[in-house]
């Protein structure tokens, strides 16, 4: 089972990322548009992988990741952002997929982080 949590405040982008995650092998997805929703969603169902934007309308992607990992332990994170340089140095151990991205680049990065074939 591979549950993916998408943290993205642009609904169309979030929906596209969730669809690509399912195409790439995720068995389920959840979408959170705020830092608070992300933490609630992760606590409700522990994700196998997190796909996260850096900037959110309410909150901050890296802050949401920090809270989730502090609560749930290690989870692979793939930042998907148009501004990779804004990803904090403390989070650069996680991978970054710059927007815009190709379907093939997403599939490859997702499968690597999710541990899928």
Annotate each PLM feature:
Residues 10-30:
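Two-component/phosphorelay signaling modules centered on CheY-like receiver
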Residues 8-9, 99:
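Acidic di-acidic motifs
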Residues 80-81:
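Hydrophobic/aromatic residues positioned on beta-strands within the core alpha/beta folds
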Residues 31-49:
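Acidic, metal-coordinating helix/loop segments flanking the phosphotransfer/catalytic sites
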Residues 53-54:
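Active-site residues of response regulator receiver
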């Amino acid at each position: 089972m591979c549950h993916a949590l998408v943290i993205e405040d642009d609904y169309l982008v979030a929906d596209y990322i969730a669809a690509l995650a399912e195409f790439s092998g995720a068995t389920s997805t959840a979408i959170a548009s705020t830092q608070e929703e992300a933490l609630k969603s992760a606590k409700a169902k522990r994700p196998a992988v997190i796909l996260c934007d850096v900037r959110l309308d309410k909150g901050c992607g890296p802050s949401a990741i920090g809270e989730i990992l502090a609560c749930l332990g290690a989870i692979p994170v793939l930042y998907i952002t148009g501004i990779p340089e804004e990803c904090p140095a403390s989070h650069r151990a996680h991978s970054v997929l710059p927007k815009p991205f190709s379907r093939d680049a997403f599939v490859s990065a997702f499968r690597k982080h999710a541990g899928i074939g």
